[in-house]
Amino acid sequence: MNSEIERRRTFAIIAHPDAGKTSLTEKLLLFGGQIQVAGAVKSNKIKKTATSDWMDIEKQRGISVTTSVMEFDYNDYKINILDTPGHQDFAEDTYRTLTAVDSVIIVVDGAKGVETQTRKLMEVCRMRNTPVIIFVNKMDREAKDPFDLLDELEEELIINVRPLTWPIESGPRFKGVYNLYEHKLNLFQPSKQVVTEKVEVDINTEELDNQIGAPLAEKLRGELELVDGVYPEFNVEEYLKGEMAPVFFGSALNNFGVQELLDTFVEIAPSPRPTKTEEREVEPDEPKFTGFVFKITANIDPNHRSCIAFCKICSGKFSRNTPYYHVRHDKTMRFSSPTQFMAQRKTTVDEAWAGDIIGLPDNGTFKIGDTLTEGEKLHFRGIPSFSPEMFKYIENADPMKQKQLAKGIDQLMDEGVAQLFINQFNGRKIIGTV
C-alpha cells in the first residue's frame, strides 16, 4: 500500500489568464502518452482544441472556465493534474482546488512577469504551506531580463527562488536553456510535437562555444557564476515546506523546457501529505479510507444530465461497491461506478489510493466539503468559502419555466459556483459570485 501512495503526485497548475497553463497541461499529457497530438488553446477555429478545455464556452473563447482533472503514468509515477481557470470570474473554483493538491506549478508569462491573479493564488498556497515550482513561459518571445524576473518573483510572491534551468537569450535570439540541475545544455528547436535533445556540455570547455557561439558562451558563463553567487543552493526540505521555489524557463507551446520540469517535478514533489480535520490529522498511509468532496460538476457527459462529485482520497484505499459512511447524512453508501478522468473522458475504476481524485455519481447527495470514511466521524478543514464580490438580479423571462430556473439555480449553488440571496422586501433572487 505504501509503495502505491509513494508514487502518487497530485498537483494543480495555476496562473494569471493567458500565461499558458492549459498549453503546459497539454504538453505534460503528451509526455505522459495520454494524447498523441497536443491541442492548441486558440480562439479561432482550430480543429483540435485543448484536452482540458472540454466545455463549449472554453472551446469558443480559448480560456479555461472550470477545473479539469487528468491523470497519467510517467516513469512509474502516477500523476494527477488539475488544470485550473485563471480568469478571476472563476476564481472560487481555483481556490477550492488548491485544498485538494499536494503541490503547485505556477506559470508566469516571461514578458509580463507576476500578475494580480498569480499573487492572490500564491497567498492561498502560502496559507497551506503548499510547495511551489515556477515555470517562466513564452521565452521564445521577447521577455524580461531573467535576473529582473527572479527579483520580481521573490518580491511579489514573497518566496526564495532558485533557478534550475537558465535561458540563453529570449525572443527570436532564444537559443535554449542550460540545465543547472543536470549540467546539460538543451538547444531550442521550435516544434510543437518533437521532444528536444539534450547535449551534455561542460560549461568551461570549448564545446559550449561550438554549440552556441563564443559571445553567448561567455555571457552564459558569467550569468551562471552570478546565479551561483546570488541564489542559495536548491534545498528540497525548504521546497517541501513552501519556503523555496525552483524556477524553470521554457516555452510550453513549442514543447521546450517542459520535460526538464516534469523530470525534476516527479523527483522532488511530495507524495500525498497529511490532511487536517477538525478532529485530528489524517495520515495518507492509514489503512482506512477517508476522502472529501472539493468540487461538483454537472453535464460532463452531454448525453446524461448527471452530476459528478470530485473526491480527493486522503488516506487508505477506495474500493468499488464497498459501503462507505457519509458523515453529513449519517448513513452508508456504496458506489458501483466510480470514475477517473481525462478531462471529459472518464473510465470506471475498481480501486484508488490516497492522493488520487475520483468521480462519484451524484444525484443530489453531495455538497462541497462532504466527508466519506469507513465509519469515523471526521470533518475536513480548509474548504474555503468566500464573500461574493459581484451581484446580479435574476429575471425569469418565461413564467412557464419557473421550475427549470429554480433547478438550474440549485445546481449552481451545489457546484459552489455562486451563492444565492433573496431580497426580503420584494422576494427577488440575487446571485453573488467571487
Question: Which positions does each model-derived feature cover?
Answer:
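Structural and coupling elements of P-loop NTPases
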Residues: 1-434
